[in-house]
């Protein structure tokens, strides 16, 4: 071993001091790449925070919508569900909570109401200029059901049937939607 190599080992160790100025030094990277890397990391963090906030808002909105829908379905107030038939604009069907179903037939100018127990069906004529709203119709039908009177005329009486018999004729003149709703129960014209 020669003496020169021992001197190298005997030198004092290098100083390990803090980075001057508090800067982050990434070895073997030029300054412009370091700046670009810092900008990219900041932009990615901002995007992640924004996307997270949007997803939380969407989740809260979805939960609120589901809660409102569930309350409207199971709630005591009237549920008004509109279902149009194959011929758009000719019939509209409304389910009025647990009290019954109303069908507006705009082609035949008829309104059919079947109470929830399904013991009878009421048919009304409507004027094309004065179509009653669902609220007005519901009030009228609830008042009509509250009275213990006999319905004004049974739909078989006009053809010579007595008041106690059920009308067993062809219901095609009522249309498919009203016939489906009222086909198996006595019909009353109000």
From Swiss-Prot:
Main location: secreted
Domain of life: Eukaryota
Covalent S-S links between cysteines: 121-182
Assigned keywords, A-Z: Disulfide bond, Gaseous exchange, Lipoprotein, Palmitate, Secreted, Surface film
InterPro entries, per the entry: BRICHOS_dom, SP-C, SP-C_palmitoylation_site, Surfactant_protein_propep
Signal peptide: none
PROSITE patterns, alphabetized: BRICHOS, SURFACT_PALMITOYL
Propeptide feature ranges: 1-24, 59-190
Residues carrying lipid (S-palmitoyl cysteine): 28-29
Residue ranges of domain BRICHOS in the record: 94-190
GO biological process, one term: respiratory gaseous exchange by respiratory system
Localization in the cell: Secreted, Extracellular space, Surface film
GO cellular component: alveolar lamellar body; extracellular space
Note: Pulmonary surfactant consists of 90% lipid and 10% protein. There are 4 surfactant-associated proteins: 2 collagenous, carbohydrate-binding glycoproteins (SP-A and SP-D) and 2 small hydrophobic proteins (SP-B and SP-C).
Function comment: Pulmonary surfactant associated proteins promote alveolar stability by lowering the surface tension at the air-liquid interface in the peripheral air spaces.
Entry-linked PANTHER family: PULMONARY SURFACTANT-ASSOCIATED PROTEIN C
The protein's name: Surfactant protein C
